[in-house]
Amino acid sequence: MPDKRIERFDPALDRIIDTSETIHDLADGFGGAQGPAEGPLWWQESGYLLFSDIHNNQRMKYDPGSKTVSLFLDGTNRANGLTRDLQGRLIACEHDSRRVTRLELDGSLTVICNSFQGRQLNRPNDVVVKSDGCIYFTDPWTSPNAPNQWDLTFSGVYRLTPDLGTLSLLVDDFVLPNGLAFSPDEQVLYINDTRRGHIRAFDVMPNGMLARASDRVFVDLRGDDPGVPDGMKVDVEGNVYCGGAGGIYVMDKTGKKLGRIVHGAPATTNIAFGGDDWKTLYFTSRNHLGMTRVRIAGIPVPVGKK
């Protein structure tokens, strides 16, 4: 693995990450050029990490106790982003089936969304759940989905109510909407536009919709090194972590770049906070899983029964 380091752009980074912290390589060999490792998700009550191996159509499990990776599920419809709802159920964005699903506590699978206004979704990419139970997800249009009369012709960001009864289109002018994350107070929703190389930010209205007039570029993450904005997470103090050119960038809540985690693997695809204290930062890349430690806990995902 090439040189690994944590770069400080601003002294404020020292409160967030120790620049001498080790960046660990945990596993590799996933997906390769055909499709990346993606969607890391910490399963708190069981103490393991799930992640997607998209090309191999598998969900994998990393056990930090034994430091081993094992097959968790074979046959995922090439799922990408993962999260949990308020009951601790697994929510997955499935590429091949072009839908969002929920794994029930009894092991059955529920399709929670597969169309908008009678037209099939494109390829749902990433997903996050708000504290009121609403599910927000991105659905980029990609060239393999040649449009026909039943297809959507735009990339969308959506909000689905907890009862699954109302699906609202929030934004439709992204080139490729990808990772998304809320600020700690859920007053702001950050959404990547991967093709444009930046993160956009929207104020969230009391009804859960986005204030379109508040749309702004939060930060531009283009650069000469490999990598584009992809998966994204936020810590409890509002600092934003996102893959970009050359590694994982850390921004404060104003969008100021504080530093970069250069982990040596090409193209960071997604990140997740985990560990008992939510201070372990896991990341996936094209075919690699790694981690480092941070000083400020990430926003936890909901936790179910053990």
Regions found by a protein language model. Give the residues of each.
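Beta-rich, blade/repeat-based domains predominating
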Residues: 23, 29-47, 75-94, 98-99, ...
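Residue-level marker for isolated small/hydroxyl-bearing positions within beta-strands
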Residues: 52, 93, 138, 192, ...
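A short loop-to-beta-strand structural motif that recurs across blades of beta-propeller domains
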Residues: 58-60, 99-101, 155-158, 198-200, ...
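Short loop/turn segments immediately following beta-strands, especially the blade-tip
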Residues: 202-210, 294-301
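Blade-level signature of beta-propeller repeat domains, shared across WD40, Kelch, NHL, RCC1
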Residues: 269-306
